[in-house]
Amino acid sequence: VSITDDTATAKNPFISPKMYRELVKPYHARLGEIAMNANLIIDMHNCGRCEDFIEDWMDFGVSMWNPAQVVNDLVGIKKKYGNKLVLVGCWDSQGPVGWPDATEEFVRSEVRRCMDTFAPGGGFAFWGSVLGSQDDPSVKARAAWIDDECTKYGHAFYKTH
């Protein structure tokens, strides 16, 4: 089950944790209760810097978060929750990897860095992408490098970890 809601911008939540707990969490908790009673996995889709709400999500059974965006303290979150919360993403699609002049080696090294940082111990699903028109050759090339490196490095990584 996916609960899709946004409570934050890239800089901060746009609703206080107190207001979230009073106004939104009861509805999310009801959805979580239904999903847990049916033994379903709960994925929270929530963009932006929304790390302030993770404890609340855990209260109603969320076990996956996408997209876990780099504006959050993802290393701290990974350390705190380990594999109890699957971080889906952890990729900066708007940073240097997304720039048209990003080199193949840089893009590939970022895939490896992301996997090396978040994959150990489980609780991680790589989700890398490049923003832009799929007709743009630069976007196509960077997306292909990401996919290829994820496949090659990911297979090798999980064989040894």
Question: Whereabouts are the PLM-identified features?
Answer:
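Active-site loop segments of alpha/beta catalytic cores
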Residues: 1-161
